[in-house]
Design a protein with these regions (language model features):
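Conserved class I S-adenosyl-L-methionine
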Residues: 78-89, 108
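N-terminal auxiliary segments of SAM/dcSAM-dependent transferases
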Residues: 1-46
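Conserved SAM-binding loop and adjacent beta-strand
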Residues: 55-69
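Conserved SAM-binding motif I beta-strand of class I
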Residues: 106-111, 186
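C-terminal substrate-binding/active-site "lid" region of AdoMet-derived donor-dependent transferases
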Residues: 171-266, 272-276
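Conserved SAM-binding loop of SAM-dependent methyltransferases across substrates and taxa
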Residues: 90-103, 173
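S-adenosyl-L-methionine
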Residues: 110-166, 223
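Glycine-centered, small-residue-biased loops immediately flanking beta-strands
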Residues: 81, 105, 180-182
């Protein structure tokens, strides 16, 4: 999957063909466009956070859809919430968060690396994520905090994707709304990071501390039809049987594709040989209102 900014007289070149932008402009989403070579075609699709996660330029390691969905659920995010994301990175999770909080919520996202912050801000503007919905800052939150709380307003949830999230836990507590139950999530690849983060969460009064690893395990499903059998008398089967009971034998020329279904169809599944492995540990905790 590729992302493309369409403009007048532009041309999209790929290994499957050439696609002039003028033939795309004005077409409805879902339209199938044939290449000039006439060999391959592409579909015009509306950009969604899921598609952006698959097509974005990688400036850092990103958070993928299974983790995104799980984090959004466990933080109990809703439209209208105010949320801090620390570690904007390539902006994969930022787009999903913005959709979850819209239309009247707000995402405050922070990035330590200045160039990455500038590139992410440019992408937000190109994707029509208005400043009223998403605010990005270049800031070292571990040293300087989030600059939120009190007159700046509190938030309902915090997400930390940092090398040392335990250094930002105290600052996160200051930014969380003390008048309600709030949640925090820390995304850490290594178990040693989880241990230090859990210790910092306990010291700062967080409760219900849980750690999860979100793994996707795909299964291949097959249609299986049992081989039918027919019965013969022992004498016709050319076998000796002292009690004269009927014997059972498989039909030699049975074709499961052409024969009528007799109800013996089964669906069976098995795990695929290769599965996606560890991405990160997700540590969640709650801060009870005062």
């Amino acid at each position: 999957m590729n992302q493309e900014t369409v403009q007048t007289d532009g041309i999209h070149h790929s290994r499957i063909g050439k696609y002039p932008h003028n033939e795309i402009i004005g077409k409805s989403y879902g339209t199938k466009i044939q290449s000039h070579e006439g060999k391959k075609s592409v579909y015009i699709l509306r950009m969604t956070p899921e598609m952006w996660t698959r097509a974005l330029p990688h400036r850092t390691q990103i958070i993928y859809l299974p983790d995104i969905a799980f984090i959004t659920q466990m933080l109990d995010l809703k439209a209208g919430y105010r949320v801090i994301e620390c570690g904007t990175g390539s902006g994969s999770f930022s787009h999903s968060l913005a959709r979850a909080l819209s239309p009247n919520g707000h995402l405050f996202t922070f990035e330590y690396h200045e160039l990455r912050a500038e590139l992410a801000k440019k992408e937000f503007e190109e994707h029509k994520l208005s400043p009223s919905l998403v605010t990005i800052q270049h800031r070292d939150v571990c040293k300087n905090g989030f600059g939120m709380g009190g007159e700046s307003g509190f938030v309902d949830a915090v997400f930390l994707d940092l090398p040392a999230p335990w250094e930002a836990v105290a600052h996160a507590k200051e930014a969380l709304n003390p008048a309600k139950l709030t949640r925090i999530c820390c995304f850490s690849p290594c178990i040693e990071q989880v241990q230090k983060t859990c210790a910092a969460l306990r010291v700062n009064g967080f409760t219900d501390i849980e750690m999860f690893e979100c793994l996707s395990k795909e299964h291949s499903v097959y249609k299986y039809e049992q081989i039918r059998t027919f019965t013969l008398n022992a004498t016709e089967y050319k076998q000796t049987s002292t009690d004269g009971k009927l014997l059972t034998k498989r039909a030699k020329n049975y074709n499961c594709e052409s024969e009528a279904d007799d109800g013996n169809v089964r669906l069976i599944g098995r795990p695929v040989v290769q599965i996606k492995g560890h991405t990160s540990y997700l540590t969640f905790a709650s801060l009870i209102k005062k």
